[in-house]
Amino acid sequence: MKQYNAIKVKHPDAILLFRVGDFYETFGEDAIKTSKILDIILTKRGAGSQSETELAGFPHHSLNNYLPKLIKAGNRVAICDQLEDPKLTKTIVKRGVTELVTPGLATIDGVLNPKANNFLASVYLGNNIGVSFLDISTGEFLIAEGSIDYVKKLLENFDPSEILISKQKKLNFLSKFNNNFQLFFLEDWVYQYDFAIESLCNHFNTKSLKGFGVEKLKDGLVSAGAIMHYLNETQHQKINHITSINRIPKDDYIWMDGFTIKNLEIFHSFSREGKSLIDVIDKTISPMGGRLLKRWVALPSKNIKLIRNRHLTVKYLIDNETALSSIQENIKEIGDLERLISKVATGKINPREVIQLKNSLAAIEPIKKLLKKSKAKSLKELSNSLDNCNQLRKLIERTLNEEAPVSILKGNSISSNFSKELEDLRGIAFSSKDFLDKMLQEQSEITGIPSLKISSNNVFGYYIEVRNTHKDKVPEQWIRKQTLVNAERYITDDLKKYESKILGAEERILKLEIEIFQGLINKMYKYIKTVQNNALIISQLDCFSSFAQTAKENSYCMPDIDES
């Protein structure tokens, strides 16, 4: 427990999932809490001794089933993994926290709502109040600064799952804002302007932030710097999908306070049977379209030109029913591009999801052609901005099997003929039946035993089974391993050599498939921004289609805008 205690003391506010063999174990108060949330058995380690402590655990392969429940219960979870192969060490296996999952930094599907962002916020109480929002599942990074009322409205509209605050400003924050949010407190030194600029410039690989148009938002940048620090502290270093930081334009939107949002039942109805505004108008098909629609409703635009452009686009889709139907059918084939490409950056994507990404990009091609033929200027502009990602699709197609499994560890993820070495190894590993049938025939002819049988188990590996009626014909060089009631089991040098060859091939196949898959992911990095842009365009198109569908169903007409 010495190793466990040394790691736990660094994460006192988190449930520590401690990898022991094939299980994640929790101890003490963590075990009591975990067993209640997950409804798993609570037992004791060292029962009756002075070191007795509560224990609860689950198989490591069930992490994605259990982790969402812990996070949804409002917990921070530190995942402590084995950092070396137990077979290669004679001492205690090295362990360390590989990820700290918090409510605001969740990338697991079971935690995330497909049609809602999951924002981590940071608030800095400076001359103004600086605030920033990051959704690590999509890469969206936003900053703003202003008065208490303005930041209150931002927090109410963006509804973050977690807010970062300086420890020294805790009471000040609580006196100004409600305490309905989940808060996490950082050391005061984290909220420094120079530290923030250095952190942000290092991440974006720039000398300044002028290119993002945020350099004047000093208090906002301080809050954003705290988010960058928090990402590093929680072991979230793979964040290439965070490609920009954008200012929230204060004057572009109508800002609604929490009271207004609640009483207009925009997102939640007062009654269980009732429907909110978003429930009524959301006809989006894709998760990312649903998220964007929610943003448009939460932050109504004041830009007259933008509003008119949206109206004309929706009118075109209403008047062109075939185009609307075709767009909707193709969007159905598109997965959550935004979150899939984020998983590429964070290294959390699996082979099946990469195939889903490829197929989603393929569905963009007919949409692009359809928009290009459109007479609506706005839709033609969207078409010009869409990228077919042909090279990326071909790369994935060459590398992965179309029926690739969820886990790379299950094997058969890599396409046949991609690697000669891999195909040769597969030939050795998967042609064992032919080889063993041939060996069986040869040994039957040599020994004169017609009823030989070759099988395997976890104890002896491969063996030859001889019925007792023929055991006097067994060659001297065969080694007896087990005596049964009606038969005896033997091994031979040739059989053991072939077994080693098969096991070696299977081990090498797995290692090679992992290497090839990781190589594919590395090659996909350069397409992140392109796919993110595609995701944004498809989201907008999905929202326009949703408005058109709602208008058709309810006989809405296009309003006139009076600027008087």
Show where each model-derived region lies.
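Charged catalytic and DNA/RNA-contacting regions of genome-maintenance
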Residues: 1-316, 325, 329-332, 336-345, ...
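Conserved phosphate-binding elements of NTP-dependent enzyme cores
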Residues: 2-6, 13, 521, 531, ...
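Intracellular alpha-helical coupling/juxtamembrane segments of multi-pass membrane proteins
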Residues: 307, 330, 334, 432, ...
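Extended, charged coiled-coil "arm/hinge" scaffolds of SMC/Rad50-like chromosome-maintenance ATPases
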Residues: 401, 484, 488-522
